[in-house]
């Protein structure tokens, strides 16, 4: 507990210094971090192999090991992220709006850092880099608490980040990591309101709900991805098949992978067999409703399947009679992450977009695009499914708040 408090104090102190650093200083730090990751890549990969071995020994399924595993390309992606974020416009100091009152006061709404941020996350060591560089670019410090399954990887990555910071003008304490895997520290971290201004949980629904229910610090809720695709009766079936394949099989362990496929009854006989043939060859287990089972031989879907984020090569399939029925199903089971319609009908697309409440609503595109990098944000600290203060992929702007700056001429209120 003492170590946790000390590190929280350190990031709080660093956040005060970061408020006034220049964009040039921040960008230089990001480039130094990228260079340090390159120098330390062998050590990072070696540490990651330890984590992957431990995960396999525990019987963790392959789709989750994929989230944990690093390789040369993923290290290179981390390094490129440092360069990419350094090249993005710095939102801090941006004048969002300004006006002059009748009494002569000049009021400006100015974007500023949030302060010291805590992030609690599971499995994915690339989050360590992504969260750190986005925080630094926006003038925030960050206290990291990664999952025990990625412990060795995270420690090696943070060591590299701190080496990069030591060669910059930013405080080395801008990035700290909780070095204990004791789960009790998570509960204690959620009470450090004196030091942390925001908590960001990334991981399972169980983790996210625990943080939301137990934190005394404001939470940026990154949600579960129970994502749907509806294949409308006017859809181009060949193109629709490509999208369903991509959304399910490219990286099934991610939160933007599709979990439930809804198919209009008028094209079910044509689409379902071709879909089942293609996906089964890639190892996908299909669970279908009673109508689906009339067209293809699949495992029966249960009620719980409609509300499950599988994070695996499993797809729940339901045949619906209309667009309205598809919308009603999504409204009932959606986690508010990413939802898609595949259609050639403009009015159906418009109705779907207007009636689906999610962070990202797609027309004729894969749900896999819900990602800060794919949206042009340079990365993300998480994908928010809440409405305040940020929604969808949370990039640089989502890690800022604002203050009002008022310029007067010795004005007094009358």
Curated annotation (Swiss-Prot):
Pathway involvement of the protein, from the record = Amino-acid biosynthesis; L-proline biosynthesis; L-glutamate 5-semialdehyde from L-glutamate: step 2/2
Q: What GO molecular function terms would the record report?
A: glutamate-5-semialdehyde dehydrogenase activity; NADP binding
Q: Which domain of life is it from?
A: Bacteria
Per the record, its GO cellular-component terms are: cytoplasm
| Subcellular location as annotated | Cytoplasm
- TM regions (residue ranges): none
Tell me which UniProt keywords the record has, alphabetically: Amino-acid biosynthesis, Cytoplasm, NADP, Oxidoreductase, Proline biosynthesis
Substrates-to-products reaction catalysed: L-glutamate 5-semialdehyde + phosphate + NADP(+) = L-glutamyl 5-phosphate + NADPH + H(+)
**Family membership noted in the UniProt record:** Belongs to the gamma-glutamyl phosphate reductase family.
Can you say what this protein is called?
Gamma-glutamyl phosphate reductase
Q: Which organism is it from?
A: Kosmotoga olearia (strain ATCC BAA-1733 / DSM 21960 / TBF 19.5.1)
Name of encoding gene: proA
């Amino acid at each position: 507990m003492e170590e946790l408090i000390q590190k929280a104090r350190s990031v709080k102190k660093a956040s005060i210094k970061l408020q006034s650093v220049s964009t040039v200083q921040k960008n230089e730090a990001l480039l130094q971090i990228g260079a340090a990751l390159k120098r330390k890549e062998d050590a990072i990969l070696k540490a990651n192999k330890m984590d992957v071995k431990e995960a396999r020994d525990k019987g963790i399924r392959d789709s989750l090991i994929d989230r944990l595993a690093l390789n040369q390309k993923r290290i290179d992606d981390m390094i490129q992220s440092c360069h990419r974020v350094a090249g993005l416009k710095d939102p801090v100091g941006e004048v969002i709006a300004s006006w002059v009152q009748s009494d002569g006061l000049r009021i400006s709404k100015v974007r500023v850092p949030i302060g010291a941020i805590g992030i609690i996350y599971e499995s994915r060591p690339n989050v360590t880099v992504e969260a750190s560089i986005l925080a630094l670019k926006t003038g925030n410090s960050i206290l990291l608490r990664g999952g025990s399954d990625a412990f060795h990887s995270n420690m090696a990555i943070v060591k590299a980040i701190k080496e990069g910071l030591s060669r910059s003008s930013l405080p080395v304490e801008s990035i700290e990591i909780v070095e204990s895997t004791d789960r009790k520290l998570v509960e204690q971290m959620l009470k450090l309101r004196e030091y942390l201004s925001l908590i960001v949980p990334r991981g399972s629904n169980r983790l996210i709900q625990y943080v939301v229910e137990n934190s005394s610090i404001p939470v940026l809720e990154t949600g579960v991805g129970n994502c749907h695709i509806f294949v409308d009766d006017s859809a181009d079936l060949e193109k629709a098949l490509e999208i369903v394949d991509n959304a399910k099989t490219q990286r099934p362990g991610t939160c933007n992978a599709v979990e439930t496929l809804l198919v209009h009854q008028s094209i079910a006989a044509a689409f379902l067999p071709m879909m089942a043939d293609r996906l089964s060859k890639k190892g996908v287990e299909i669970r279908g409703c009673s109508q689906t089972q009339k067209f293809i031989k699949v495992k029966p879907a249960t009620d719980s399947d409609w509300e499950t984020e599988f994070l695996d090569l499993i797809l729940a399939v339901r045949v619906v009679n209309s667009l309205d029925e598809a919308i009603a199903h999504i409204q009932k089971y959606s986690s508010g992450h990413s939802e898609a319609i595949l259609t050639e009908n403009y009015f159906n697309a418009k109705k779907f977009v207007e009636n689906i409440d999610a962070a990202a609503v797609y027309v004729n595109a894969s749900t896999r695009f819900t990602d800060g990098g794919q949206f042009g944000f340079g990365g993300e600290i998480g994908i928010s499914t809440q409405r305040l203060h940020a929604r969808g992929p949370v990039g640089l702007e989502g890690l800022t708040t604002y203050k009002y700056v008022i310029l007067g001429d010795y004005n007094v209120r009358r």
